[in-house]
Curated annotation (Swiss-Prot):
One of its GO terms (molecular function) is lipoate synthase activity. Residues 73-289 form the Radical SAM core domain. This is Lipoyl synthase. Pfam families: LIAS_N, Radical_SAM. The gene is lipA. [4Fe-4S] cluster 1 binds at C61, C66, C72, S300. Its EC number is 2.8.1.8. It is found in: Cytoplasm. Keywords: 4Fe-4S, Cytoplasm, Iron, Iron-sulfur, Metal-binding, S-adenosyl-L-methionine, Transferase. Its main location: cytoplasm. It is an enzyme of class 2 (transferase). The keyword Metal-binding applies.
Length: 323
């Protein structure tokens, strides 16, 4: 997965997390063996890195030290982050910079579409920072990016990973009307953690957003992801699964939270691979079409391959229902 920011700020680098500067340092737990990966050295990785540098793009994968960077870049998987690199929220888990965002780049939709075509992407994920400063939360910009990709690379399937559009009436409806193939909105964590982990969001607003997508377009695939290791209890994770199934969400991803810096929320535990497998089994039993659950699972990890499996799972379900 290549997470690509849309611009390079030529100005002096801002303090990345000013809102966290006052927080005491927290202990960073040593990663267990099952989290560690080899350094990226493949030809495909080098080629992807060259493409990124050629287009003068910045990647969160590099800055955040994503554990999947070698695997994803080797396969030229890409996730574009639109609407700038500065977020209006300050979630305790996230390494994206917080502050006052810059104005939208009106050329960005076409530039993203050109990159998708030049990289030959069969599946692309479009995500963004939160833009609470915009009247529509960036919905129109999402719409324009989707349209531009459809025009430049018609065969590419499009997955969007959106913010929650909190207090932005009509924003969700506009994005759904643009017809992405997959609508992803991450719950991030269980309800009991929202005040400390995701204070700018509302748990049941996010559940309702995912439910509303299905009401607007029952054929659209919906997806959500969470992190574990933030102090949640198992029963809270199972309740979250039930809430997502009530919203008819198709695809659930579960991955291990990794602490970006000492100023971020600490890792409370490293969940074992066996526990991840158990979560996967339970999630399938609750009716999800697709489940990805492992320590290194990330929301856009294997997104293209998973989309193909997701479509196949739906077709199988429809055939079984027709018998």
């Amino acid at each position: 997965m290549v997470t690509i920011l849309d611009t390079i700020n030529p100005d002096a680098k801002r303090v990345r997390h000013p809102e966290k500067a006052h927080r005491p340092d927290t202990e960073v737990m040593r990663k267990p063996d099952w989290i560690r990966v080899k350094a990226p050295t493949s030809k495909g990785y080098a080629e992807t890195r060259a493409i990124v540098k050629e287009h003068k793009l910045v990647t969160v994968c590099e800055e955040a030290g994503c554990p999947n960077i070698g695997e994803c870049w080797d396969k030229k998987h890409a996730t574009f982050m639109i609407m700038g690199e500065i977020c209006t929220r300050a979630c305790a888990f996230c390494n994206v910079a917080t502050g006052k965002p810059n104005a939208l780049d009106m050329d960005e939709p076409e530039n993203v579409a050109k990159a998708v075509r030049e990289m030959g992407l069969s599946h692309v994920v479009i995500t963004s920072v939160d833009r609470d400063d915009l009247e529509d939360g960036g919905a129109e910009h999402f719409e324009k990016v989707i349209w531009a990709i459809r025009s430049a690379s018609p065969a590419t399937t499009i997955e969007i990973l959106t913010p929650d559009f909190l207090k932005k009436p009509g924003a969700l409806e506009r994005v759904v009307a643009a017809k992405p193939d997959v609508f992803n909105h991450n719950m991030e964590t269980v309800a009991g953690n929202y005040l400390t982990v995701r204070p700018g969001a509302r748990y049941f607003h996010s559940i309702r957003l995912l439910q509303r997508v299905k009401e607007l377009d029952p054929t659209m695939f919906t997806k959500s992801g969470i992190m574990v290791g933030l102090g949640e209890e198992r029963n809270e994770v199972l309740q979250l699964m039930d809430d997502l199934r009530t919203a008819d969400v198709d695809f659930l991803t579960i991955g291990q939270y990794l602490q970006p810096t000492r100023k971020h929320h600490k890792v409370e535990s490293f969940v074992t691979p066996e526990e991840f497998k158990s979560y996967e089994t339970v999630a399938y039993s609750k009716g999800f079409l697709m489940v990805a659950s492992s320590p290194l699972t990330r929301s856009s990890h294997h997104a293209g391959d998973d989309f193909a499996r997701l479509r196949a799972a739906r077709e199988k379900k429809l055939l079984m229902a027709a018998e």
